[in-house]
Design a protein with these regions (language model features):
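Extended basic (Lys/Arg/His-rich) segments that typically form rRNA-contacting surfaces
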Residues: 9
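Hydrophobic alpha-helical transmembrane segments
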Residues: 2-6, 96-98
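Soluble, non-transmembrane catalytic domains of enzymes that act on hydrophobic metabolites at membranes
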Residues: 191-200
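Membrane-embedded catalytic scaffold of the fatty acid hydroxylase/desaturase
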Residues: 12-173, 179-189
Length: 200
């Protein structure tokens, strides 16, 4: 069951990346508006972006809760995705099903808390803060953990204070974290808006 749960977490992070990039942001089309297979979700998400750019990362929709159409859309979308994938994974692995349900709830918790407590977001999920407040909003697609942003080369760091302790986005002993970061930077290097100066 644990192997299935861990595999489900990896699949959920990959889905988070794909859904954020292709459904919530939509794909560029020359001379036309962006395309999303779920246009209402894209509309909701771009309104979310406009809101947080105006309010220094805070989203009042989460304060309003269920009565806010964007919050309601996010909750319903997560429930549908969790229901569909949980049902599909159940015959294969109950651990994967459990991880899908956990991941949907965790995504909502992390995303909501980040936009209610911007200082917490800067410390705990700087990749998502970078996604909204960086000059390039078409990068840093992961919300809960930056795994697939590193794997797919879309982690763009705007400043040293917005660089996570390590690419797993998990608190680890400093020695382990440093070794992991060094290895990942060799294999899957993050991009920088402006490369940090090396102090000799």
């Amino acid at each position: 069951m644990w192997k299935g749960f861990v595999a489900g977490l990896v699949v959920a992070n990959a889905f988070e990346w794909v859904a954020h990039k292709y459904i919530l942001h939509g794909t560029h089309r020359a001379g036309k508006p962006r395309y999303s297979p779920v246009p209402d979700s894209m509309k909701s998400h771009w309104e979310h972006h406009r809101e947080v750019r105006k309010t220094t990362f805070h989203d009042h929709g989460y304060v309003e809760g269920w009565s806010n159409w964007r919050t309601k859309n996010e909750i319903v979308s997560l429930a549908v995705v969790a229901g569909v994938f949980g049902t599909l994974f159940y015959p294969v692995s109950k651990g994967m099903t459990l991880s899908v349900l956990y991941s949907a709830g965790n995504y909502y918790y992390i995303h909501r808390r980040a936009h209610l407590e911007p200082d917490w977001a800067m410390r705990k999920i700087p990749w998502h803060y970078d996604h909204h407040m960086n000059s390039n909003q078409d990068a840093n697609w992961c919300v809960t953990k930056p795994w697939f942003d590193y794997i797919l080369g879309t982690r763009v760091i705007s400043s040293l204070d917005l660089q996570e302790q390590n690419p797993l986005g998990i608190a680890l002993p400093q020695v382990v974290s440093n070794k992991l970061t060094q290895w990942v930077n060799q294999v899957f290097p993050a991009k920088w808006v402006k490369a940090p100066e090396v102090i000799m």
